[in-house]
Structures are given as structure tokens and as C-alpha cells.
Amino acid sequence: VLSYNRLLDLGLLIRKYLRHCESIGMFARISDIKPKTVEELKNLRHLGFDGISIGTESGNDNTLAVMNKGYTANDIIEQCKKLEEANIRYNLVYLTGLAGKGKGERNAINTANVFNQLHPFTVNFVSLTVFSESELYEEIQRGSFVEATEHERLLELRTFISRLHIKTTLLGNTVSNTVPF
């Protein structure tokens, strides 16, 4: 996590050495935004910070808790509204399959309900990929987490899109998706 002061220093260096740079983008977590005030975010926006990609992954409190994300659906709303107030564009990432077998529809509905309260520039879809060195892989081996099938993930994505009622661009062009679009 980069502090406000560190981001400010980086922004000033970029402005000094890359004078024609129009936008400074980055990846962030909801918890990275939380310690920054709206005034600090406005200062960063003035330096060119814009187009932040946020790996929210879900807007379902149960899924967020089980995956130890460290924030709630309400936190997503609060922090993204701070970005909006600071006039910083942001992109949200939704991770299909994260809730596990049989839980995708509820996850999709709750996430769409959260995203419908926001104004993301884009919503990116990525499908869960479990790596052998992850804690989730260990949970799968123990039987405490069962992965959603590809069919379930497609149904989850369809449910999410059908419930999403905001003006945004939807992107699903990653190799992790069953049907990239």
C-alpha cells in the first residue's frame, strides 16, 4: 500500500520528468483507498492519478468474509464514492466462481446491487483460477471449498449482467473466462 505522501511524491516526479503524461493509472484494493481523504484524492487527481483498477472481486459480504478480503460491500460503496467525489475514474473487477459451488447466483445478485450504486468506467470479468500454492487450493484439498463449474460461472455471469443497470463498459476479454468477450 502506498501512502498518500508516497503517491504525492511519485506524482510530482512523474510531472517533472514525464511532462506529457496525461494520466497515471494503477491497481488498488478497497483497503488502499480507505485511509485517504477526499481532499487527498482530489490532490492526487490534480497530479493526473486517474483510471484506477480495483479488484473488488465480489460485492457479497459472505464471499468477501470467506475469502478474507478485509472489507465489506458497504466499504466498496463508501470508497468508490470517495473516488467519484474526487473525480477519479475507476474500473471494477468481478471474479466469477469466487463464491464456490452453488453460491454464484446469490453472489452475482448482491454484487450487481452494490455496483448499481456506483459509476465505474468499466467492469471487468475474470474467472477464478486457483494456484497450487494458494490457501484456497489447500481448502479445496481439505474439501472445505468446492469450485463452481464452468457452467455455473457462465450462469453467474449471466445473472450479474442481467441485474446490472448502470451505464458502463463490460469487459470479459481474459483467457480465464470460458467465453472471452
PLM regions: where:
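Core AdoMet radical
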Residues: 1-4, 18-35, 49-76, 121-124
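Short, acidic/polar
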Residues: 7, 35-43, 105-113
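Surface-exposed cleft-lining segments at the edges of enzyme active sites
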Residues: 62-69, 96-102, 144
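Short glycine/proline- and charge-enriched loop/turn segments
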Residues: 137-144
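Acidic (Asp/Glu)-rich catalytic clusters
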Residues: 11-19, 41-48, 81-85
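A short acidic, glycine-rich active-site loop
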Residues: 144-151
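Radical SAM enzyme core and accessory elements
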Residues: 178-181
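Conserved C-terminal portion of the radical SAM core fold
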Residues: 51, 74-136, 151-174
